[in-house]
């Protein structure tokens, strides 16, 4: 896929999060890597009205254009630390949030869940350290 096709794909998937109740209209963010470019949702964007041309370009070296998501540094770190990562989707799904509220790790009870995700740790990272610690935790 070329850059423009990937931008369209990212916007569609970001909208689907909202349409399927896995994100509210203005929280979370998403990005994809295209060579040394990282295209990310703008800070405060609305999933319902986001267009491919609204995505903001950042670079693997850490440079960011104005308007990039407040979590752009986190996305950049994920790509720097995991060269196989092609996309990052960060949502605030109500079910995922509810599962983490007691602080226990999530262990699926169904066969398929156990097969694909036998153990999903709940990771607590202080806000001031999340850019440094989160990329390693999800790698």
Language-model features: locations:
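Glycine-rich flexible loops
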Residues: 1-139
């Amino acid at each position: 896929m070329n850059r423009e096709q990937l931008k369209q794909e990212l916007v569609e998937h970001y909208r689907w999060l909202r349409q399927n109740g896995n994100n509210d209209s203005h929280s979370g963010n998403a990005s994809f890597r295209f060579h040394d470019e990282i295209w990310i949702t703008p800070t405060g964007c609305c999933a319902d009205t986001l267009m491919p041309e609204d995505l903001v370009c950042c670079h693997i070296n850490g440079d960011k254009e104005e308007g990039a998501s407040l979590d752009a540094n986190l996305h950049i770190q994920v790509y720097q630390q995991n060269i196989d990562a092609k996309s990052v989707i960060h949502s605030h799904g109500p079910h995922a949030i509810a599962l983490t509220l007691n602080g226990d790790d999530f262990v699926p009870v169904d066969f398929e869940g156990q097969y694909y995700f036998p153990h999903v740790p709940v990771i607590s990272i202080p806000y001031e350290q999340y850019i440094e610690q989160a990329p390693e935790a999800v790698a």
